[in-house]
Amino acid sequence: MAVDAHDLDHRARNLSGCIPPELVSRLLELGHTEVVELHAGRGEWFCAPAWARLLGERDRQADASEVLAPYLATGWWTAVEAAAELLEAWGRAGEAIAITRARMEAGHPLALECHARLLARNGRAEEAFTLLRPHIGELSLAAALVDVAADAGRDEEAAALVSARTGHRCSDFPWCCRGFDRETALGLLARVRERQGRVDEAIALLRAGSTTSTSDAERLAALLARHGRLEELRETAATDDSVYAVQQLAGLLEERGDVEGAIAAYRQVGGAVAPDPHAAFELARLLARHGRGDEALDVMRVQASSRGGDDWILRTLSLLYLDQGRPGDGLAHLDALAVACGGEEEWDLYSIRLPLISARDGVDEAVAQARGHPEGTSSYAALHLAELLAGAGRTEEAVAVLLPREQPRPGRVPHGPRPHR
C-alpha cells in the first residue's frame, strides 16, 4: 500500500473519496471489524487508527504498529499524533515522546505543544515548562504552559508570565497580539487561580474580562457552575446574551434534581416558548431526557415554523420524531414546510427526510427516493446514503457508495498547498 501525505491530508480535511469517521464508528458498532481492517490496509485513514486501537486492546500492539506504519512514514502530522497517542496508551511513552520530538525538531508548527503536553503527562512537566516558556507570546503555547505549570510546581511563574499580558490593549486585533489579548490573558490567569483554590480571585478576573469578551463571560459561567455558586450564576444568566450562562444554570439545577427549575431557566430566555433557537434546542433536549418527548416536539415545532429554512432545527425536530416513533408525522411536517417554501428542497434540507423515510418505508425506499433527487448522485449525498445502508447492516454497499472506482494515485491530488510535513 502506497500512501501520500498530500493525498491523505486532502481527503481527511474534505471527507472526499474516503470512508468518513462517523461511518467507521458505525461499522465498528455493528461489529463489521473486517470491513474496517480491510480498508485500513487500503489507504483509508479513518479506518487505520480505529483498527490499530482495536488491535492494541487485543494485545496485538506489533500488528497495530504495522497498520499505522505506512501512514507514519509519510511524516503526515495527523498520523504522527495518532501513533503517539496509541503508544502512550500502551505504556510506551518514551517512544511517543521520541516521534513527537523528531517532528518538533523538524519545525512542525503543531509539534511543540503536543510534545510538551506529552512530557508533562509522563512525569517530565519541568522539561515541558522550560520548552514552552520562550513561546509565552503564542496563545496556544501559553495555554499549554499554564496547563503544565501545576505539575511542574511553577504556578506562580506561569501567573507572572500571563499577568504581563493583561495590560495589552488591542490596536488591531488579532494582528497586534496574534490573538493573545487582555481578556484571554485574564482567562488564563483565572485558570491558575482556580487551580490554586483562589476561586474568588478567579471570579473577579473573569468578571473584569467578561464585559468585553464573550469567551471570558462563558468561562465565568462555567466557573460558577463548577463551584455551585447558584445565585451568582442566576445573576450572570439574567444578563447573558449568548445563552451559555443559562445553559450552565439549567445544567446545575438539573444536576441538583430541580428539573422544573432548569426548564424555567430556558423558558425565560425570550418568553414562554423559548424563542431563542439555541435555548429552545437545549430545552428540547432537557425535556426529552426526562421522558417529555411531546413537549420537546412542541418546542422545536415552534422553532421550525418561525425558522423553517434552518436545517439544524429541522434535523433536531426530525430526530425527535424518530425517537418518539412517529416518522410519518415528521414527514408530514416537512411536507408542509416544503409546500410553504415553494415545493423544492436543496439537498441539505431534503437529506433530513431520509432517516424518516427509512423508518417508515424501509431503507430501499429511502435510497431510491434519495437517488431521484437532482443532487442524489453527488459526493455529499453519498455520505447520507452510506449512513442509511450501514445502519441497515449493508456495509459493503455503504462503502461502495463512498469510494470512487479509481482513487487518485499518491501525489496526484492537485488541491491546495502541500501540508507541513
Report residues per predicted region:
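Residue at a conserved register position within TPR or TPR-like alpha-solenoid repeats
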Residues: 27, 39, 55, 87, ...
